[in-house]
Each structure stands twice: as structure tokens, then as C-alpha cells.
Swiss-Prot record:
Role noted for this protein: The SecYEG-SecDF-YajC-YidC holo-translocon (HTL) protein secretase/insertase is a supercomplex required for protein secretion, insertion of proteins into membranes, and assembly of membrane protein complexes. While the SecYEG complex is essential for assembly of a number of proteins and complexes, the SecDF-YajC-YidC subcomplex facilitates these functions.
InterPro entries in the record: Preprotein_translocase_YajC (IPR003849)
Pfam families according to UniProt: YajC
TM regions (residue ranges): 33-53
Keywords in alphabetical order: Cell inner membrane, Cell membrane, Membrane, Protein transport, Translocation, Transmembrane, Transmembrane helix, Transport
Biological-process GO terms, alphabetical: protein transport
Organism (species): Rickettsia conorii (strain ATCC VR-613 / Malish 7)
Lineage of the organism: Bacteria, Pseudomonadati, Pseudomonadota, Alphaproteobacteria, Rickettsiales
Protein name: Sec translocon accessory complex subunit YajC
Amino acid sequence: MSANTQDNQANNNDTIEIQETEVVPAETNSLQSGLTSLIPMVLIFAVFYFLLLRPQETRRKEREKLVSEVKKGEEVLTNSGIYGIVTKVSENDNNIEIEIAKDVRIKVLKSAIIDITSRTKEVAVKKENKKNKKVSGAKAS
């Protein structure tokens, strides 16, 4: 019996007590982790929109405005690098006629125009005049 008693005492010493604790539902943790992983994605999209998409959209609108305002007699530059003077603007089919040399005219799409060089030259001349006035005003003082 003494062996049995020793075994019972050993078993009593080896027992583990289990305590009940509150169990947090796993769904709450997964929902929170899902939202926290979504926040960086939303921030990346916002940065992408403000740095890339929005400026591109404004450039596209400026280009459409430029193309729609082309008039006869203006010097233009096409996307293929050809300079010419607009001789005819066709509103209904989006084409314009450009004279690239004396009696040499080509027909191109309005969307092929990348710059109206006559306007660019006017702006450059105005800036040059303002600069000259400031310099001459400074010398007079």
C-alpha cells in the first residue's frame, strides 16, 4: 500500500488547475486588423491621386483648351516636330490645314498640335520688355 500511497501523492502534486478566463471573439481582432491594413492603402491612393492623377488631369484640360482655341494665321508646332502657319480650321471634323512652306499645305488633326508658338513668342517678348523697363529704370536712378 505504501507504493499506492506514494503514487497518489505524486498524482496530487502533478495536478494542474485550470482557471476560466474571458474569451475575446476572434472576429473583433480580425476586423480591427483588416481596418488597420486598409488605412495605408487608402493613404497611398490619396497620395497617388494628388501627385499623379490630378496634375495630369489639369494638363489635359489645358491642352484641350489650347487645341480648341487654334485660329487661322497662328504659328503652331505639331507633335511630329513640324512648324507651320494655320491656314484653315475645320470645326466639324477636328482637322486643320497648316502651311509648312510656300504653297505646301498639310492637313493634320487638331490633337496633333502641342504648342502655339506665336503665342509663346508674344509672351516671351512681353517678359523681355518688362525686364528691359526694370533695368532702364534702375539705371536712371
